[in-house]
Structure formats: structure tokens, C-alpha cells
Amino acid sequence: GINEVIVAHGDPNPLVRGNGISVLEQAGIKVQSGLLEKEAAEQMREFLHWCQNRRPYVTVKIATDSTGSVDDLSLEAQRFTSDECLERVHQLRKDSCAILVGANTVIRDDPQLTVRLVQTDRQPLRVIIDPNNRVSPSAKLLNDGNPVQHLTENFRGLPALLDMLGDMEIQRLVIEGGPTTINYFLEDGLVDEFIHVISEVNHVKPVPSNFDLSSFSKVETSNWGIEKVKIYTK
């Protein structure tokens, strides 16, 4: 039989909260907890955040040119990062429960926001903030058969949106929208992680981003393909 169990991190889920350890101890099994607790907490980051806040962990992912521009209005909407970077974005989508954009992104890019470049058994929920109902009924997001929440007159603001997603057990939300949507989240202090992908290109007719990242205390650097990446957390 089992004589001893080592638990890295307690379960904060209010439906469980310590009951598992109590059951083991009542059965005469010795329980040790706290081994590699910090590492376990990092691995369960989104789940712990959801349990404690009943809202998803919010990640922003944005790509800019070398000057901080998010788009080049001299061209048709197109990707300006490498294939390797795109694969990392699809992995990020796979690791998420929902992807969010605003109406401007759907109108400009007509994106799919699905996982296609890595193997997956499910697609994330796509969320569109469109309070003025400007998105065309023919948009790919509304017609591909994958899960979507199109928020029009029923949009009640960002805190209410995060509460709704939390009630749906969405544990991680990735924002892939443009600067308007992202800045609304930043201004309300609702972003937990900010992933800035920096391309080597220079836009001819740039769209400045003007993101205020002063609320983030930590930054890590990485590479997604040839692109440099800065990951900001609190």
C-alpha cells in the first residue's frame, strides 16, 4: 500500500481546498507538502489565478515593427513576422482557453484565430468585442463552425466580460486585438502578462502603439524565430 504522499502545492479550488490531504491523513497516510511549491505554482499559474479571482489570467500578445508600430497602413493587412514566430503564436493559442479581439481587428484582418500549425484536440473560444455591431456577418470568425462569442449590445464592459468568462471556467484569455482594445485592458489594470514580439521590419505608414507598461515589474527576453520577444509580468 501507499505509506506517504508528497504534495507540491495545495489545491485552492473552493470545491476541494485541502480535503484531499485530509482524506489521505485520515486513512493513515503521511502527507508532506511544499516540496517545489514555487515551481508547481508557476506550472499551475492560470489555474491558481482563476481559483483565487474567478477570472481568467489575461495575456496580451502583440507584434510591432522595430519602432513600435502595430500595422502598416500603406499595405493591405498582412503578417510581418516569421513562420517560426507564427508557430509559437499557435502554440500560445493552444495553451489558452479563449482568444479576444475588437471589432477593428476583425474588420481589418478578418482573422480565424484558430490553432492550425500545432496539433490540438480543441479550438479556443474566440471573443469579439463589437458594441456597435460593425463586424460583417460574413467574417470568418462567425462562419467557420468553431466556438465564438460575438458581444454586441450585450457588452457590459471589461470587468463584466472577465466575470462572464470566469463563470465559463475560462482560465486563460489571450488578447490578440489592436492597440485600442489592448489599451482599454491596460488602463483598467486587467492585464497579467504582456508579450511583445518585435520584428525587424520598418512600417512605411506606421500605427503607433503607445502602450504604458509601467505597471509590470518583471521582464524576460526570448526569441520566437528571428523575432525578439519581451514578456512582461507583475
Model-derived segments and their meaning:
Residues 10, 17-22, 50, 57-234:
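Enzymes that bind and transform nitrogen-containing heteroaromatic metabolites
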Residues 1-40, 184-186:
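Zn2+-dependent cytidine deaminase-like catalytic core
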Residues 36-51:
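Short, structured interface segments
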Residues 29, 54-56:
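Short, well-ordered coil/turn segments that N-cap beta-strands
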